[in-house]
């Protein structure tokens, strides 16, 4: 890496990618991020009666876990730097494709082999340190912002005289030749950080959930909590979640607030369940703001981390 490499880089204004989920529009950052996986999960899940199946039941959790495996498998195979790889975003987000993927789910049995094994190294990398914040003002502006230098202290290199630390996101490249995310010069890797937006009419929600590769699956759970189950943003963040850290296999982690009946139902389907704690940061940590059609603001902050929802006093 030379100074010229850094000097020639330019940030880009990008249009978000989106899908609709039961009448709500969900926006995510486009590739080279994992945002597309959250949208693919929701497209797959829309083929099932999630509300009727109940919140955090074995039936519902099984569908989410299986949808996660399918969406992440496609993401890992297809997503890289869009300037250097052709990424079939339209196909990946099509209803036809989601319906075909949904048909692959056995509602009574966990699928343990989905992702190509040569991409497993990404899932085995250590967790990252990420911050998320969201803000809204009286004029209707809303910001959803996430940032990370990846592993603790990033690369550990500080640019002299600046005080900022260079990241080490290059660790997320694959060394396998011919992949969208194969390491290469002047190339951005597939990465994890994704701020989110959710909208129906004049009701708008900014949200984000920190947690490495957990983020897309946590986004899908948050959106479902709001859309399928009618939770407010605080409940939607605090509700018990699952996380699947690996991209293959039947392992899954559940917070202990998930009912024992649901846990046993998953085990009976072949999931290798590990329970964590009631509020475990391994499933992600989030913040959210909702602006309703009347302009009233509601905010939520996840109890799994430090952080809070803070109203600012109006200026005199």
Write out the residue ranges for each language-model feature.
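Glycine-rich phosphate/pyrophosphate-binding beta-alpha loops
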Residues: 27-35, 131-134, 146-157, 209-216
């Amino acid at each position: 890496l030379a100074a010229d490499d850094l000097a020639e880089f330019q940030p880009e204004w990008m249009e978000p990618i989106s899908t609709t989920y039961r009448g709500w529009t969900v926006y995510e950052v486009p590739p080279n991020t994992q945002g597309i996986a959250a949208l693919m999960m929701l497209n797959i899940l829309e083929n099932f009666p999630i509300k009727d199946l109940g919140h955090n039941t074995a039936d519902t959790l099984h569908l989410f876990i299986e949808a996660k495996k399918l969406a992440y498998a496609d993401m890992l195979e297809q997503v890289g730097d869009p300037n250097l790889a052709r990424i079939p975003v339209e196909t990946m987000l099509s209803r036809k494709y989601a319906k075909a993927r949904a048909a692959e789910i056995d509602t009574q049995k966990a699928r343990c082999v989905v992702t190509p094994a040569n991409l497993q190294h990404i899932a085995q990398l250590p967790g990252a340190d990420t911050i998320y914040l969201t803000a809204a003002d009286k004029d209707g502006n809303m910001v959803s912002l996430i940032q990370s230098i990846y592993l603790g202290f990033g690369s550990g290199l500080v640019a002299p005289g600046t005080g900022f630390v260079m990241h080490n996101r290059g660790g997320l490249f694959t060394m396998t030749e011919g992949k969208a995310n194969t390491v290469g010069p002047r190339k951005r890797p597939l990465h994890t950080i994704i701020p989110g937006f959710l909208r129906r009419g004049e009701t708008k929600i900014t949200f984000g959930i920190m947690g490495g590769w957990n983020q897309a699956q946590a986004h899908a759970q948050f959106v479902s909590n709001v859309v399928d189950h009618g939770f407010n943003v605080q409940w939607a963040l605090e509700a018990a979640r699952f996380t699947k850290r690996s991209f293959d296999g039947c392992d899954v982690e559940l917070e202990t607030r998930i009912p024992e009946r649901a846990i046993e139902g998953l085990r009976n389907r072949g999931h290798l369940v590990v329970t964590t704690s009631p509020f475990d940061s391994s499933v992600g940590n989030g913040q959210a703001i909702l602006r309703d059609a009347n302009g009233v603001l509601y905010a939520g902050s996840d109890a799994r981390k430090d952080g809070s929802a803070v109203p600012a006093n109006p200026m005199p």
